[in-house]
Swiss-Prot record:
dDENN FNIP1/2-type domain segment(s): 731-836
Keywords: Amino-acid transport, Protein transport, Transport
Molecular-function annotations in GO: GTPase activator activity
The species this protein was found in: Candida glabrata (strain ATCC 2001 / BCRC 20586 / JCM 3761 / NBRC 0622 / NRRL Y-65 / CBS 138) (Yeast)
PROSITE patterns on file: DENN_FNIP12
Region Disordered, annotated ranges: 314-343, 488-509, 752-771
Domain of life: Eukaryota
Residues of the uDENN FNIP1/2-type domain: 34-223
Function description: Involved in extracellular amino acid uptake. Required for the protein trafficking from the Golgi to the plasma membrane.
GO annotation terms (biological process): amino acid transport; cellular response to amino acid stimulus; positive regulation of TORC1 signaling; protein transport
Name of this chain's protein: Protein LST4
Lineage: Eukaryota, Fungi, Dikarya, Ascomycota, Saccharomycotina
Keyword Amino-acid biosynthesis: no
Family named by the database record: Belongs to the LST4 family.
GO cellular component: FNIP-folliculin RagC/D GAP; vacuolar membrane
Amino acid sequence: MGERFEGLENLNDECKVKLFGCRMRAPGSGTGGHESIEYRLLILEENAEMVCRQRYRTILDYSSRGHGSMGLKHDEMTNGNVSAPFITASELRQYIYGSPIRSKTRVTEDKFRIIPNSRQLLITRVFYPRRTSMNLHGTFPKNYQSSDRRVSITMCLPSYLLADISDSWADIDGWLTQTERHLMATSFHVVETQDNFVTLVNKLLIPALRSCHEIPRLFLYPQDNIDFIHTWFKDVFNWIELKEGTKLSFLPFLIAKTLIEYRDDPQESECHRIVITSGNLVIANKLVFILGGLLKPRYDGEMKIMITPVSTPTPSNHLMPPSMNGSNESSYHSSSNSHTPSKLKIPATINEHRPSRPRYSSTENIHVQSRTMDIPIVKSDQSPFSTSRGWKIPSSYRSATSSVSISSDESLAEVIQPSSLKSTTSIPFQNFSSSLSNQLYSSSYGSWFNGSITGSFTNSNPLSNGTSNMATFSSSFKKNNISSIFQSNSPTAGTDSWERPENNTGLNPNITLQRTASNSSLRHMLTPYQQQLISPSTNSEYDEYPWFGATNNAGGATVGTSSETVGSQQPVLLQGAHMDTTTLLDSIRTSNNNGAYTFPLKNVGFDRDCSSLDHHKLLTSCFEEIFEGDIDANKVTTMVPCSDIAVHIHSKQEDSEGVTSHPRVVIDVDIPGTTISKYPEELLPRYTMYLSHFNPFFKLQAIPATNEIENKIVHGLKRDFISEKCDVSKTLFISMRSRSIKEIVVRKTTSINTPSNSSNQDPRNKSKGSMLKQKIKKVFSNGTCTGRVTPVLNNCVAFVEAALMSAMSLYSDPTIDKKYRDERILKIFLAVAHYNVDEV
């Protein structure tokens, strides 16, 4: 945690709105610009003599900016760019111990407070050493004599962390407990063991505070927000169409597993999290948004939408997302009256080849009246083609001037131009050096990366151990599905190879691509600048690996592309599709008058930081309207964040006797039934986006795939027993590279048969007779369920399949009224989100 969090720079505005509810600012602006948290650790001991001059003894006084006692300048302690005055240890004693008159009870006190005029806060534990405070070896320190001495452990931190103290209190309490145990183990002789205490701070406390202060958390939209529900179903359909291929089993199984075991808040004795590993943040964030739409607790307050101006795209530039005004004068309206352009395609049915031209090169739209969602479709003169084999190297590139060697296996190598690198100046080719064969479209998921996987897999039942038939859902979905592709310009359609395209790549047109026996790549023929561009793009979904939507029709396989891009070609119906072009267009558009798809989600009308929502502006505006003199008649203002409290402001009225009354404020509290609904919490749950490394303090996250990730997760699960004080900690581990799902469980067990003084037991667990047992089990792999499938999970998977099919039928039927469709979609989503095992 020494480095600052940097992850928002690679996200577009639409992804930020989906994940965070607003266009989050770049890293640094929201974290205060602090590279690290500076602290001061102070351990003091107080004896029982009130009149003694040597009443206090300093055991440890350490500062992160130097060595020894503070190690700073003598007159200041620096916190980032803000200088805080230096506070002597004698002055801190007064804040730590307070009055010298003690209470009769010998209790442990945990407290925190801000030191006036110092921009610092104190976190303190004051305790009496007693025999229940065992050390690390489960025994009491030697030569210890019970006395009235009081020991204090104090952490001095910058005051800007005040809002994060309460959120991190479980981790702070765990750090204080571990520090107390280490202190008892040393018999209060800390000079030789100072590094141990500093290590505890750097491993347990500082990472927890920085995680709460710097890493943005997901905003879980209200469960009845129709714009969010439309966006959620679109992402689900896009995922199924572009990522599932012929076996529609991965996502339904993952949703069912999440609903049953990971949706609700865990019990006090249990702690769980969801971790996604992927090499591409676009794919990972899509899955984070899908799973986050099912988790709890959700925001339950009134939402106001902030309207921002929309910039008009030009043919020469890419479409830039509208920027957030950030001014206090922003207006708030309902989300149905605002439109912002989007790069998100409508659900599930648009497969496209990478266009070789810059996006939005043409601005002519096709307007089609329909009942579902609108999407901008751009005309083009480019003709499509379909193929049943892999892509070949363009033969027209062959020349004698230069050559590039590609490995000569029995299979073809893929050279694909990523959409994220489309440019008219310099676009290198991206080489997929994995072995491809004609079994590509029939092999199991992840076979590109596992050379040991041979043979082909048929469309068998993915949940072969007693679960519902996924193949039925697959064929049913494909029947109702609308498949189309955006393809590049090709003079000859229906051929198995590309003709020579336009030379807009920035490469030498005389480069020859030939098959040789060498293993060299394209890199040695490129300039250093072009080699830099070959690195994986954060905006391309091909970087993970393209899951081809294979079909058994004569038309062959289709190539899915990123759902984050909108091409400039006209969609063409695939061979073997079950709908004509009119039905295709009608099934993926709404009945908006302008006929253009608009991203349904907008900026929510309140500020937020990384960990919480800020309703200061809305509350201030509400109270200003209450107390201002000139008030509109019968004006109603709804306070945020609580949707169950409404403030009604009535203007001056005359009663029956002609007496004019002053404006009155009536607060109506809606109490459903006999239970009072909870106020929406400002603090957001610990769910976050794609991070550069595993963070054990978050319950939902996506990270890059590494070899050590499972060990890090197990280590994070063991830390839960310190901070959360739980008995079971488990993680749902999702690997996008191998399309597998694992469950990692660490459980605390009590050893009954083993004596407490046994030598083969962990010394830390001798006094309590407990030990930790870990288990890693694979629950889903190669498109099938590999573990034991319970009837509860089987029923939930079938329910998710039926719900997705019902939603798909509503979106694909152009005759359904928009209002009726919204009502039905809302009921379907609520049925999925509130799936109850006991009611099935």
